[in-house]
Amino acid sequence: MIATWLLGWKWLKTIGIKVNRSKPKAFAVAEKMKRELETRGVAVCFEPDIAADLGYPELGLPLEEFASRVELVFVLGGDGTLLGVARQLARYQIPILGFNLGNLGFLSEAETGGLSEAIERVLSGDYVIECRLMLKAEVIRNGRVIESGVALNDVGIAKGSFGRMITCTAYMDGNFLGTYTGDGVIISTPTGSTAYSLSCGGPIVYPGIRALLLTPICSHTLTSRPMVLPSESVIDIHVSAVHREMGITIDGQIGYCLKEGDIVRVKRYKHSALLIKWQDRSFFEVVRQKLQGESVDVSRVGGEHEGTAPY
């Protein structure tokens, strides 16, 4: 079972709204959402720039004040938007509900066509909160941590723009796992098992399983296979690519360059992402609908990255 709890009926005083401004319908949906919530006696707030663009600058709050005031956050965008908000709010432990304005919408629970129904379900307590495991990644150079970040989906270590292989040597809790020569490796959460890892041959892992996945990317050997590892383990990836570009990406959105001899350390993050889910919609139903039943333009999926890796 996924770690969940029923929130039950609770009078929500303030709901935050996060908006991806690049989505054509985002501001219109945000305006409608604001009206419906205020009609029901719920206050709303936004990020300062979004509030200003909507014409309500008084509703814009900086992050710390935003996080201290809201009890729940609605996210208007796609999966990429939700990933960014999950990373931003994880340390505040605020539940988030995604409204899909993107292409795939695998992580988003609600559709904007059912906006009023979704708001009613939230205000009546008709939902559960799922605790999704997150990752913390550190780049270690000459014994010192030089970069770090957290991920909900995955941490990718990959070659740069030229078609030359890199070598990744993996250790779990100091024990040698294997050496992977190819395009790189992915360390993912169960939530991320349906993302980049899946396209590289990794398994779909039920979100409630406490595990980490290690998936090779185009490994140049017949014996390299994805591995499912304990969630409490510490994974060290030693990278080697003399005179070649390589880098690390976090949820496909944040990137750092790597150098020969760097170590990427990945472990479970101390906080979980709190995702709002409907009780009558199962993970397997979403898998069937999103990954089997829909025609997806793969050239556009994942196009919501907020940043590009610098390699």
Predicted feature descriptions by range:
Residues I17, V75, I187:
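Redox-cofactor binding/interface segments in oxidoreductases and associated redox assembly factors
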Residues A26, G80-V85, T194-S199:
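Short glycine/serine/threonine-rich phosphate/pyrophosphate-binding segments
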Residues T179-G182, I186-T223:
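Gly/Ser/Thr-rich active-site loops/lids in small-molecule metabolic enzymes
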